[in-house]
Amino acid sequence: MRLSRLLIGASLGVALSSTAFTAALADVKFGSLYPISGSLALLGEESARGLELAVDEVNAAGGIKGEKVVLERGDAVDNNQATGEARRLISLVGVKAIFGTYSSARVIAASQVSELAGIPYFEMGAVADEVTGRGLQYLFRTNPTAENMAKDSVDMLIKGIAPGLGKDPKDMKIGIIYEDSSYGTSVAGHQEDNAKAAGLTVVLKSGYPSNTVDMSSLVLELREKGADVVMQTSYQNDSVLFLQQANEAGYKPLAIIGGGGGYSMQPTADAVGHDLIDGVFDADYTQYAVNTSATPGLTEFVEAYKAKYGSQPRSGHSLTNYVGAKAIFQALNAGEGFEPDQIVSAVKALDIPDGQTAAGYGVKFGKNNQNERATMMGMQWQDGKLVTVYPENAAIAKMRFKK
């Protein structure tokens, strides 16, 4: 009897070990590399939530090629740590690909590591030209770019804001200010180029460190130059600082156009007050107050977000990362496997038409592995909410102008 029990126990142990081993084989590990601490943590965490929701969705549907997706997280608090975390995820954890990263500077640093290792890197939030401009073989970007953001800023000024103010856009003076990392520099450069190509007047283009604690001299310079339109590309803290110090100085340009970042965040509006931010424009990723006929799946995304995190999404960064990750997962599910070249082949074959994602744009990788169908939208803060006002097919409100 005792021997029988031992044999049964041994057999059961082998069976359980075999099951555990099989389960381990049925997991595919991906890296999730975002700034989740430090000055970029708020938008980094918001971006990571989109990836997490895409993973939840694909796992609920049976995983990718029958394998459960497991996210291994890394904290890209600065460029050095982004590089170190990429090495750890690849060498020690053994991830098949890395997803991230929100910050242009962080992904530029980290993707050098993945490229040398031959591991695919999917960027779903950083906009700087240099992200894809280096011609890396294993880096793909699903989201819109700095050029998209700049073009939408200028187009919105010419086609909507200037007519709404009763102005000829060529009579308006534009001041371009920006945080001086790869993100802000790229957007500002394209804004200047687009404005000048359209015959508009740029009276100031000036960068500053994103961690600045005083923008009063920049406010004064804008005022002295007579800038009646300000385009600012910024993170949250510098968005708040500029709006507050411009208000304190009594500087009231006819229009402020944010370039995503802090201008797309509800916490920014709450920090400066709804009376102050109302009327401010923003060119950025698809947000939530939008015509949902142009963004199929957006309502379901918001419901899933609220169920998991207990609040409304804080910006469109989570949505953009969700859409990007979901598209990549779709490609991998149709692919041959998880070896680097198999992953690259699968995503290069991806072809999602416009109007079939929750962000509204399609996905197809073109030159330098950039999603050539990615686009941005134009929003305005109205009654404390960021609502879509441009383009017309996605708008749910008309532009408002203060008298």
UniProtKB/Swiss-Prot annotation:
Listed disulfide bonds for this chain? none
Question: Which Gene3D superfamilies does the entry link to?
Answer: 3.40.50.2300
Q: Which domain of life is it from?
A: Bacteria
Checking InterPro entries in the record gives:
BCAA_transport, Leu-bd, Leu_Ile_Val-bd, Peripla_BP_I
Q: Which family does it belong to?
A: Belongs to the leucine-binding protein family.
Q: What function does the entry list? A: Component of an amino-acid transport system.
User: What is the protein name for this chain?
Assistant: Leu/Ile/Val-binding protein homolog 8
